[in-house]
Amino acid sequence: LTKRAQRYAGFATNFGCYIPKTMPFGLVSAPFTFSKFMAELLKGCEDFCVPYLDDVAIFSNSLDEHVKHLDVILRKIGNAKLKIKPSKCSLGRKTVKYLGHVVGNGIRSPVEAKIQAIVNFPAPKTKTEIRRLIGMIGYYSRYIKDYAKIVEPLTNALRGKNKREQITWTPECQKAFDTIKGKLVERPVLHAPDYSKPFIIQVDSSNTGTGVVLCQRDEKGEEHPILYLSRKFIKAELNYCTTEKECLGIIYAIKKLHHYLDGQPFKIETDHNPLVWLKSNVGNNQRLMRWSLALQPFNYTIIHRPGKSIKHVDALSRV
């Protein structure tokens, strides 16, 4: 810390005044400052390294390449006079635990300890406890099919002006609680995106919500999910006609997933046949015309698939 910063970081106790010479934990600006420092330190290594505060993930295609990448990173850290604790390092692994996920071999899944914490979570008795539970499971919502539908009884229990009042734990709440636990215990797996292959967005909307799956197909034609999305329609959107609701699902998907889709062709699969003509003919519907214009920067093709062939997306929309 600079001399000026040391004065502001100091604190007084019964035993005297303590002034840190280096940045301690607990300062409001510490995460930003350290993140900026690590980003500058590892500049030029973005192709094989991702820093997050004091965690550095290094990924390589082979062991020889990994050794070279390690050498580059360790030299940069050494030149900056930073220290690494060996017991907290994990080198040359096929899979690693990173930010609550087990990552490696092109797939990711939730960390077992995090799942166990949710499984051991007692039935909530207050709105505060429900929010804590939803916060825990919400981090893994992209692993769970029809997540919005499953947690609906829990989110409905949060209604009311009093944010801390006791709740009535209904059988529907218990069922949602048990279902979420069961879904996570199954150890869901998501695949890493392969940018050499086209992305596929599968969209299906019901009367009350929309469900989305981002996936890719391998050489055998098997679908591999990358993530799941779903949301309810707000009050105004509930009044939309069927075609508008289906198109709204596409708009929602592309807004959420544009960083996967920018600059490359992709397919949109829907069970609503009229949307196949979205690019060329939307009639006189002003809302569909605006959405069609909003989609023009993207290179997409809409393909009709019967609802029976995309059941997992159909389930996501039943919220």
Predicted feature residues:
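Retroelement reverse transcriptase polymerase core
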Residues: L1-P265, P274-N281, N285-W291, Q296-I302, ...
